[in-house]
Amino acid sequence: MNDNRTRPHAAADAGAAGVLPVILGGDIGAYSLARAFNEAYGTRSLVLSQSRTHLIGGSSILENRVVERLESEPVFLAALAAVAEEHAPAPLMLLACGDWYVRLIAEHRDELAASYAIPYVPLELLDRLTQKDRFLSLCAEAGVPCPRTAVYDPADPAGLDGLPLTFPLVAKAASSADYHYAQFPGKRKVFFLDDRAALDE
């Protein structure tokens, strides 16, 4: 599962932090977290990524291990169990760069918490804070102004007729974690819709 050829010369090391960060992801966010720990504590974080990226692949401040299909639940759990076994009994902190990884951590919190410190809220609260349709009600309760929002299910085209909005619209997936796994031509994080035809498309 792990591609040892992608490891830099030195292994991960907790340094003065007293805890080893295990970071999931291969983007600038993963590098930034590793750099912050390195600058503050001399830590060499362990970064698990699905591929070797130029941002983390050759960095001397972290150890990068490639785990193919890391975002797949069984692979995710097996990889983290192997890391925990390898580093036991050292304290580990699990950090994620990607909503889908945060959600996987939250869904398996009880299992992972036996080996990792998890700095994320429980799943129920995570859903309230990150699901856009539920977050809207929280804003209303707190009196926080936000753009007028309505939830539309593409599987129910007739539902659009009752929405209290008019074009042009900005559309986003209600769950960015779930949307990560969706694959279709023209996929974007945000859609700008000038009319109904753009929505149907």
Predicted segments with their positions:
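Active-site nucleotide/adenylate-binding loops and adjacent lid/helix of ATP-dependent enzymes
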Residues: 128-201
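ATP-binding N-terminal substructure of ATP-dependent carboxylate-amine bond-forming enzymes
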Residues: 1-124, 141, 155-159
